[in-house]
Amino acid sequence: MSGKRLMVMAGGTGGHVFPGLAVAHHLMAQGWQVRWLGTADRMEADLVPKHGIDIEFIRISGLRGKGIKALLAAPLRIFNAWRQARAIMKAWQPDVVLGMGGYVSGPGGLAAWSCGIPVVLHEQNGIAGLTNKWLAKIATKVMQAFPGAFPDAEVVGNPVRTDVLALPLPSVRLSGRDGPTRVLAIGGSQGARVLNQTMPQVAARLGDSISLWHQVGKGALDEVNADYTRVNQSQHRVSEFIDDMASAYAWADVVVCRSGALTVSEVAAAGLPAIFVPFQHKDRQQYWNALPLEQAGAAVIYEQPQFTADAVAATLAGWDRPTLLAMAEKARAVAIPDATERVAAEVSKAAR
């Protein structure tokens, strides 16, 4: 058993927190002690303790889009957060820290480095976040999920949930399927409106040639159901939230969704063709996440202005079952199913 200590620094969104939890659990099973560094007002504050991991808090928030007053106060806020993080590091003395992104990683990584603790970074997105960009200069090891975020970093993929990794391969799952094309439309919390507005119109154009399962997000169920009914397509399944996403992937022939880092990695691991609609962000992060799957012939990217019912219906109508199977196999070939083990191995190597 290891007995070594890891501090995971991650917060703000599920895209940072869930991969961190996967690596933490993997190392805890090998006897590591793990603690978490986060902020008290973001999702990690509730989520991490539910996973049996103690969490320490520092006070820090993002600087993007803040007024001049906030920017002038930033150096003092960062210094105070660094001081809090340094006190936590000195008290617990981890053998290594793992930065998975979010504002907390900045002061946390600097504090670890100033204490002589090795800093390991993992970038989940196809374009590096601001915090990871400057922490990379002091890190012992930098890893990336997709090629291109850093010029020389090792590509290790994103840790993906075990129930998704356990799905049968596309050749097993999709062979012998017939009937309407099963389309899984995943509107999440971030900008699901465009999918919710467009997919009923797609259904109207394709009729009985597709079977839709549409996750619409919180509070949108009645409105979207009414839209399907209005175009005489009420036979489709509309859910506010899908709890068992692995089962939904297993059911689907093709997925229509945003291209957040974890979604793209899950779609690849599941082995599914995709139509990706990147969230419109100024650094085009989601576009770069989806690009490797499009380049592999496993997906099509529609920027939001091009994501029209006519375009999506034409694309889906052009994919027969042999095409869908070939695309599914290409998606699975791009996946890195042992990402959790790869990240954990680098953490072990870097530990002092």
UniProtKB/Swiss-Prot annotation:
Q: Which InterPro entries match?
A: GlcNAc_MurG (IPR006009), Glyco_trans_28_C (IPR007235), GlycoTrans_28_N (IPR004276)
Q: How does it sit in the membrane?
A: Peripheral membrane protein
Enzymatic reactions:
di-trans,octa-cis-undecaprenyl diphospho-N-acetyl-alpha-D-muramoyl-L-alanyl-D-glutamyl-meso-2,6-diaminopimeloyl-D-alanyl-D-alanine + UDP-N-acetyl-alpha-D-glucosamine = di-trans,octa-cis-undecaprenyl diphospho-[N-acetyl-alpha-D-glucosaminyl-(1->4)]-N-acetyl-alpha-D-muramoyl-L-alanyl-D-glutamyl-meso-2,6-diaminopimeloyl-D-alanyl-D-alanine + UDP + H(+)
Q: A GO molecular function for this record?
A: UDP-N-acetyl-D-glucosamine:N-acetylmuramoyl-L-alanyl-D-glutamyl-meso-2,6-diaminopimelyl-D-alanyl-D-alanine-diphosphoundecaprenol 4-beta-N-acetylglucosaminlytransferase activity
Asked whether the keyword Cell membrane is assigned, the reply is yes
Q: Which family does it belong to?
A: Belongs to the glycosyltransferase 28 family. MurG subfamily.
Q: What is this protein called?
A: UDP-N-acetylglucosamine--N-acetylmuramyl-(pentapeptide) pyrophosphoryl-undecaprenol N-acetylglucosamine transferase
Source lineage: Bacteria, Pseudomonadati, Pseudomonadota, Gammaproteobacteria, Enterobacterales
Q: Which gene encodes it?
A: murG
